[in-house]
Design a protein with these regions (language model features):
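Alpha/beta-hydrolase superfamily serine-hydrolase fold, recognizing
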Residues: 1-349
Length: 349
């Protein structure tokens, strides 16, 4: 049993290497610096990143361990011939958190699948504090949840590789519904920070579902998302902004070049219903960007709910012990309400 006092070294010994590598994926393989000292505990990690709640990380990890003990949970998104042609695609994975609750398959029972993308400034994928705890809660509420590890920044421009990875993951799930025991008839995408940008792009026809000839997600569920690339990076000092823009889009880019990837500038009435949670005290991504996005969705007559707790910061993931706590269940309720279904959660006996 993992606790807040469990060390990184102990977690590594509990998890198989291929699962441990999914906790915080980056090209350095050091958990974006969090795992360089393996004597650190989850409580130590929270002390360094206060928004990363140790109890939430414990909840996600213990759920992952239980799932792994029951069977396979880690899947390659791309085929071997695709990874041979592009080795970076070998790092694109899905971690499955199967639904832990079930309806009784009554007339109005609908199975749903949620695909989550963690944040990390497109330089890492921070599943440990974000997608894994959220997926564990969604699974406890009857949602099959899969956490996507997508390609992150390197020397070459990154975009649109993450968008390709999300589309490939959705296609993989449609092709493997029976093998994974999931249903993609009703699916949604969600994400956190940069992963929120990725999920939000999935709802744009030109960047997401229509471009890749996929059914549209029924909902987009976002936590403190990066919605406008230029505005989000504009607050950074010039050298850092240039460095990140180069990593995302290549050298010599400017505001106009970011346009296709600015979610708030590319929505229309066909955008999926959207739930957003964003703390007002977020000092990394301005909450006002989410507010402006919500206003744009309302203008386009797209169903939208935005929650703006006063406190929570950036990176709260599931939101345990913050004013955002419970947002996962509220987001799932919102998703269900778009299809006018009875909202109920029934735990398996």
């Amino acid at each position: 049993m993992i606790t807040p006092e469990t060390t990184i070294k102990e977690i590594r010994s509990i998890l198989q290497d291929n699962l441990f590598s999914q906790l915080i994926y980056d090209l350095s393989e050091r958990g974006a610096g969090r795992f360089s000292d393996e004597s650190r505990t989850l409580k130590d990690i929270q002390a360094a990143d206060p928004a990363w709640n140790a109890d939430d990380m414990v909840f996600g990890l213990n759920t992952l361990c239980r799932n792994a003990a029951r069977g396979r949970v880690l899947y390659d998104v791309y085929r071997s011939d695709e990874t041979a042609a592009c080795p970076g695609k070998a790092n694109v994975k899905l971690v499955h958190f199967p639904a832990e609750t079930a309806c009784n398959y009554e007339k109005d029972c609908v199975r749903r699948t949620l695909i989550l993308a963690s944040g990390g400034a497109y330089g890492a994928v921070c599943n440990l504090p974000e997608a894994f705890p959220a997926a564990a809660e969604a699974a406890a509420l009857g949602i099959d949840c899969l956490c996507l590890t997508y390609r992150v920044g390197a020397l070459a421009p990154l975009f649109p590789k993450p968008m390709e990875d999300l589309a490939a993951a959705i296609r993989f799930l449609f092709s493997n519904e029976q093998n994974l025991d999931v249903s993609m008839k009703h699916y949604a995408v969600g994400g956190f920070s940069a992963g929120g940008h990725l999920a939000a792009c999935g709802g744009i026809k030109e960047l997401g579902y229509r471009k890749f000839n996929l059914p549209a997600p029924e909902a987009v569920l976002l936590a403190y998302p990066l919605l406008n690339v230029w505005k989000a990076l504009e607050q950074l000092p010039e050298p850092y902004r240039k460095l990140m823009l180069k990593g995302l889009l290549g050298s010599g880019v400017d505001e106009s070049y970011c346009g296709p990837y600015n979610v708030d500038q590319n929505i229309d009435c066909d955008y999926p219903p959207c739930f957003i949670v964003h703390a007002r005290d977020d000092e990394t991504v301005d909450c006002e960007l989410s507010s402006a996005f919500a206003r744009a969705l309302t203008t386009a007559e797209v169903p939208c709910v935005i929650e703006k707790p006063e406190h929570g910061g950036h990176g709260f993931g599931r939101g345990g012990k913050t004013e955002a706590e419970g947002w996962i269940k509220r987001a799932i309720t919102f998703w269900k309400e778009q299809r006018h279904e009875t909202v109920s959660f029934t735990r398996k006996s």
